[in-house]
Amino acid sequence: MNESVRYAWFGIVAIFLVLIGAASYIQVIGAEDLRTHEANTRELYKQFGGPRGPILVAGEPIAESVPSDSTSFNYQRVYNQPELYSGLTGFYSLNYGQTGLEQRLNEWLSGTSDDLFVERLRQNLTGEENPGASVELTLDPAAQEAAYDLIPEGVQGSVVVTEIDTGRVLAMTSRPSYDTNQLAVHSTTEASENMDALVESGVSPYMNQPTADTAQPGSTFKLIDAIAMLESGEYDTDTVMDVPNSLDLPQADVPITNFGGGACAQRNSAEFTWVFAQSCNTPFSQAAMDMGQEPILDVAERFGFNDDSITIPLSVEASYFPDEELHDATLAQSVLGQVDVQASALQMNMIAAGIANDGTVMNPQLVDSVRGPDMNLLEEPQPEVYSEAISEETASQMTQMMTQTVEAGTAAAAQSSVPIAAKTGTAEIGTEDKVNSWITGFAPIDDPQVAVTLVYRNVDYSVGHRLTVDNIGTIVEAVVEQ
């Protein structure tokens, strides 16, 4: 063989090997990247028109794929009782992709999870469709409906109910809500028009309010303050404190005041439990300036503030207490749940639940179990401890003060057939006569089972206070006594 022929032969072999290698890479190594690439519209249309695992509550589907009459897609994603669950399920849309649990649980629902690999091989051999896995949620349908009914039409609000010793979410809902079916339609034009209408009406279809919408928590943040005070060793439940009606702040023109005309204006001094139950501002602000910022920040972070890693598995917007050094005047306002302090409804629920659970905070959990198409159990999340936030003794002291808040304090109207321990909060939001109204607590007091948090945004003070203190008893009775 002459030299030129030999070189040509080597070149042909090299080209052949390169082609074999490239084909192997595409077929084996790069196949998944190509399949899931955002430009692969064929795969997108295939997935959107295919079956998808259901999301279940008490065994009944709240999201499911049903056969479609469409000539383009074989299946339609359908949401049942969508207003109750839209913030949780999110939507599965050809226009807007996936949100909520549809997005967070996509590998299970679409059947692409590694745990379903053998099932996919079997389906490929038999030619069957991949129906995905089914996901059962922890929600109690009666509790979810009762919680939703506590938010009046036209009011922005959130309700969270969790099981204290496990962290299981029994109810999580909010208003304004919307019909997720409007965004799951096959027509991209119709879906776009529906999205525009939702946004114009003030609905945020990408947000689950109880986990993602943070707001100033007002005096519910005094739960954190009170724990820091008890842990300091300078206070116990009977410590007598000054209760001035006005507290001047260093380098500030506006003093801290107590609620005008309330019980705090009637006494010059009182025991800590009474101060807490009546939610007097000035003693808490003075105590914060005396203790400094660090103890309060430490307690807040033990309960979850400033932690952006919490998932349920929905991602949870981090609640915020400043970790940069604050001047005394700003600290005195911040410990009242004002200024830059922000909290989600779930965060304030974790605080109440942790106190009720002898100081142990559990990771909130929304998924009960995941099962394959053959009903084989694939995953069953177990209760997990988030933190050992406070001692059992401190938790007992906090329970005593929260109980007094309901028996003879700002939450007296929350008394019900099930004994409740709670803390109210009213956050000024800079809009005349409008506030964020909060309550968070647990029940029954002697055998805590559930933690409940309600928040109503941008409401009149009287309306918000009535909604919180009246409704916490309603939801507690609905859950505990059913």
Labelled PLM ranges:
Residues 378-384, 470-482:
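Short, gly/Ser/Thr-rich active-site loops of penicillin-recognizing serine hydrolases
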